[in-house]
Amino acid sequence: MVRWGCATAVAMLGMAMASPADANEPVLLHAAGSLRGALTEVADVFSADSGIKVEAKYGASGTLRDEIAAGGRAQVYASANMEHPQSLTAAGKSSPVVLFARNRLCALVRPSLAVTPETLLDTMLRDDVKLGTSTPKADPSGDYAFAVFAKADAVKAGSGKTLEQKAQQLTGGPSSAQGPAGSSVYGWHVAEGRADIFLTYCTGAVVAQRENSGQQIVMLPEPLAVGADYGMTVMNDSPPAAYRFALFIVSAKGQQILAKHGFAAPALSQGESK
């Protein structure tokens, strides 16, 4: 069951039905990069069903939020956290935020490096192991990785600071290398040797492993587990088509597509949140 209030649902439905949609005007979607595969398919199915096109821009959630807050043209904003869309709502720029999907963090590990959930922390702390993350604040994936480091202190005193200092923030920043077009940037960094272990979303780790034979996915042990709540908002003055698309994302059909790409429905726990 998708977590949103009755008032929000009724308001969105009312906006969606307020006037006939102009199929010639695409819905403008800004979404977290980790949603690219899932929401591309969602948008394709929505367009086939409704005749309404979706024009998508994917990137680091924080960077997209800053762009929208500065006046960038957007209608539907889907973030890898709740805080970024909530800040737009608090500023009076958008509708109440909907929690529409959940993810969790995993460790993407280079081939031949022996790691299990039980040995992951000790392995990340080794001097000869390169640790990669995304960029905190700009990209929620980086914030979630640093939440893992904070939890590590409860397992081994002082380890959190050590991990923060050694972690290379390789993705998600304004000047981060993008990697080959159409390929996993996380798998690329691991394949190129810039990281032996990369903390990233489990959904992204699956894509990286599929593209890079031999790369491993290691689940975080319960004491380090961090889940990711994904929030969506619709910008004020958006056309009815934008609300229709937002409703489609949280519909049974939209949620089935998200689940196919590894995302969990909001009612299902994906590890303790940050």
Q: For the regions a protein language model found, what residue spans apply to each?
A:
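Exported/periplasmic ABC-transporter solute-binding proteins
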Residues: 23-72, 79-82, 86-90, 98-103, ...
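Bacterial N-terminal signal peptides that target proteins for export
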Residues: 1-9
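N-terminal signal peptide c-region/cleavage motif recognized by signal peptidases
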Residues: 16-19
